[in-house]
Amino acid sequence: VAGRRGPTFLRVTLGKELRELRERTGLTAEAVSLELGFSRSKVSRVESGDIPLPKLADLERLMDRYNVTDPDDREVLLSLQRGSLSKEPYLSYRNILPSGMPLYLGLERDAVRIRSYEPGVVFGLLQDESYARAQMESAKVVEERTTDAVERGIRIRMERKERLIEPGGPEVHVILTENTLRTVIGSPAVMRAQYREIVRLSSLDNVEVQIIPDDLPTYRSSWNFTILEFDGLSPVVQSDSYKATTMWSKASDVGQYRRQFDDMAKAAPGPAQTPRILHDLEKRLWNE
């Protein structure tokens, strides 16, 4: 497993395994931290995947405390720990990313299915480079970003898109609102290029895009969210705020977002209608 997965996935998986072992012993995360001489929050942060567990001795002490004696069981955890310490793909970008985004990006790389709803801007994996540039440039002053930070942000976004065309890439299903696509980012020329990029990507076998028309009387979530599903790990949900990315893994939370997504997907015109909707929208907006 460790050889096929990214370090973020392995870190989160290791945390999940350690949490389950701790819960079987009836101990709290704080109690284990204090007993083993860790900082008060260390165990809970390791279990959530927020931080790695770089010291082999720390993992061995946890395994001993949780009565993990079988050599094979110990090797599974040791393998996860070793793999989780390899270089993070987005480590060099960490200083320009909002809080929580490095964890999300690391997990996105290993997702087998991605479902996203975006009511404000085009979902990052679908963005044309000119659209991404215009969006980031428009926020440059407000967010106090340097030109270098903008360029690096664009590079991240374009690198993420490459997974869509890689062998074994994820299944991607995106729901956008017409209002998102009517909101001009950059210029009409940028928007036309973005429309064409959505059409191009939606022609891929693993990508579906739906658009909720403005005049369709149906439910719309007020905030964006993305559901990531994995092979060998429970799904997670991500949502953005101004300065941070928040993630949920509780089954009831994930279920709630799944119901929202499924309801909107059922109501919106099917993916086959997306090229026509974009063509009609372009004609209405710019009379072409």
Predicted regions mapped to residue ranges:
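Short alpha-helical DNA-recognition segment
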Residues: 26-45
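Short acidic (Asp/Glu) and glycine-rich catalytic loops that position anionic groups and cofactors
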Residues: 42, 56-60, 235-240
